[in-house]
């Protein structure tokens, strides 16, 4: 169940930070995909000494993640949070997506549409010394452009393209993906 709150990037960063500190209790490697890369990079800025490697799989563009809530997005989030109209809009929007059928998910959905879960990670990336790699699919040219955005902000980021896949290399070419993960996480890197 997802409570009726506004989900923010800070909430996810705090959850991730607490999980690494309190549950894992040591240095860890993180693989993140899509929009969740903002949570990981922001958490790394807070606890860089406890993160060994970060692997970003087809990350969302830095420009998209830099969007902040504005009047229009706040209004949209408020409308989706309304009991009857919001549930209807959520059901129409979620019908063709992979979102859950549970009505409680609409609060997360409204937070995403309202840009509450995004953060400008360019500032987070600039100061990181953690080993970072971006994996993208060769069949999706937009992922290459997004990876280049990351490399332009932090030139030490390694970019790897996996052949025979698009937006989901971890599913579309799992063997090649796992091979790259093994190479990146080996002690020799």
Regions inferred by a protein language model and the residue ranges of each:
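Active-site loop/oxyanion-hole signature of alpha/beta-hydrolase fold enzymes
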Residues: 1-29, 179
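Flexible "cap/lid" loop of the alpha/beta hydrolase fold
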Residues: 5, 41-46, 50-81
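Short, hydrophobic alpha-helix immediately C-terminal to the catalytic nucleophile
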Residues: 17, 40-45, 178
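Conserved alpha/beta-hydrolase fold motif
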Residues: 30-31, 54
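Gly/Ala-rich beta-loop-alpha elbow adjacent to hydrolase catalytic centers
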Residues: 31-40
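Conserved alpha/beta-hydrolase catalytic His-Asp/Glu region
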Residues: 64-130
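Conserved loop-alpha-helix segment in the C-terminal half of the alpha/beta-hydrolase fold
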Residues: 133-165, 171
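Catalytic active-site module of serine/aspartate enzymes centered on a nucleophile-bearing elbow/loop
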Residues: 157-189
